[in-house]
From Swiss-Prot:
This is Elongation factor 1-beta. GO terms for molecular function: translation elongation factor activity. Coiled coil: none annotated. HAMAP family: EF1_beta (MF_00043). Gene3D superfamilies: 3.30.70.60. Promotes the exchange of GDP for GTP in EF-1-alpha/GDP, thus allowing the regeneration of EF-1-alpha/GTP that could then be used to form the ternary complex EF-1-alpha/GTP/AAtRNA. Pfam families: EF1_GNE. SUPFAM superfamilies: eEF-1beta-like. Keywords: Elongation factor, Protein biosynthesis.
């Protein structure tokens, strides 16, 4: 089986969301879904908002990133989460 590397873009609900706590929550979520977190970074967006990017490594399987993406979208402080890059290694 191949290894999948995905970049997930996560938008918090507001600028008041604690950035480091959100990054730690996302890292734990990835690792609790049989995947490895290869990095979490943030970029300023506008008006105090920021975007968080999560690099995920996992074995290729049916359903792919869907369970992780859905779990991220279900988090209380997350407005949206979507896979923006996907590649096989």
């Amino acid at each position: 089986m191949a290894t999948v590397i995905a970049k997930v873009k996560v938008m918090p609900t507001s600028p008041e969301v604690e950035k480091e706590a959100l990054k730690e929550t996302l890292k734990e979520l990835v690792e609790n879904n049989d995947a490895k977190c290869r990095g979490v970074s943030d970029e300023p967006l506008a008006f105090g908002l920021y975007t968080v990017f999560v690099m995920v490594e996992m074995e290729e399987k049916e359903g792919g990133m869907d369970p992780i993406e859905e779990a991220m979208n279900a988090l209380e402080n997350v407005e949206s989460a979507e896979v923006v890059e996907l590649s096989l290694v």
